Amino acid sequence: MSHAARRASELALDETTVTALRAALKTTADEVVQAIIDEVPSYANALSGRMGGTIRRAVRTALGHYLDLASGNATGGDGDDAAYELGRGEVRDGRSMDALLSAYRVGARVAWRCLAAGAVPAGLPAAEVAKFAELTFAYIDELSAASAAGHADELAARGRAHERHLEHLARELLAGASPDVLLASGQRAGWQPPVSLTAVLLPAAQARPVYRALDPSTLVLDDLPDATGVLLVPDADRSHLLRQLTDRAAVVGPARPWTRASASYARAVRARALSSDVRDTEDHLPELVLSADADAFADLRARALAPLRTLPVATARRLEETLREWLLHQGRRDEVAAALFVHPQTVRYRMTQLRELFPDLASPHRVLELTLAVGLRGS
């Protein structure tokens, strides 16, 4: 039994007073409900019809239980449980905690006015009336607190469920689930699909702090392998997003239609594997293309650069670097020399060696093959 209920049982109202108060319970419940309708906007249209009847019965039951306590005739049961469930139900009906507490305040005032109107004519002494008032408000306060707890618990449970649905959707997006599956998951999570999603990889510890600064519809996971987090940012302004990620160890994938977010994620993962310095995958497309099939790239290099294998390792490395700069600078000797930090004559000498090793160096096919083969620095 609650503290207020124990104190109420100490009142020991006489049978005459209790009978008078019970006779007014229906009228009291009607007036309480009407006052709530009139004074609390959230309930203006909620307490009519069958719902209104349910609430009136609940008010009569709660006050009747209180009168049982006050007369010393309580037979068990606890109004707190019903009040707790009422609070949970208010969340399901879409009403706020403020609306619920306002309804209790209005209800307490009107209920006491009606109870006092019955107690005083029944001959309850003034001192007992004062105590009755105090305990009535204390009892209703406890019911209010129980409803508030139910409301808060239901909100928390719904919040956790909502978060689980969003996390499930994010995992399905990363896994490349079918559009039908993704649409169903999005609806279950109450998530409005955008046109595009951009994947952002970053350390798990940074995922939530960054997430809080982004579009509220951003999806976040912070429990991926290797202490990695991922954000799926809807319809991102790329330049703005990159500025927001300044000083973060983030890798930003390309924007992709939202059902293909897995492609953005996969590219970000591959880009991060290339180098820890990668930030914007759009700045590293050549490297990503050349590294897409590692075996094919290794075979291409082995075939295209086979003539260099006859040379000492250091010599082969210098000539490969010279060949790379020569291809990239389209044979402009001074630019090649500047890129290599050598004299132009050194470039001339090395190119003579390369032409001897690659007699068909001017062939378009050979130029294409060699450009691809030396395209990744340090391969």
Task: Name each model-derived stretch.
Residues A161, L174, Q192:
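Short, contiguous, pocket-lining structural segments
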Residues L169-L173:
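Regulatory cytosolic signal-relay segments
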Residues P179-A199, Q206-S379:
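Cytosolic nucleotide-utilizing catalytic cores of signal-transduction proteins
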Residues S102, L174, A294-D295:
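Short capping/connector residues at structural and topological boundaries
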Residues M1-E167, T218, T322-S379:
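Alpha-helical/coil-rich non-catalytic "connector" segments in signaling and regulatory proteins
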Residues R164-H168, S178, G190:
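Canonical alpha-helical transmembrane segment with a positive-inside/aromatic-interface signature
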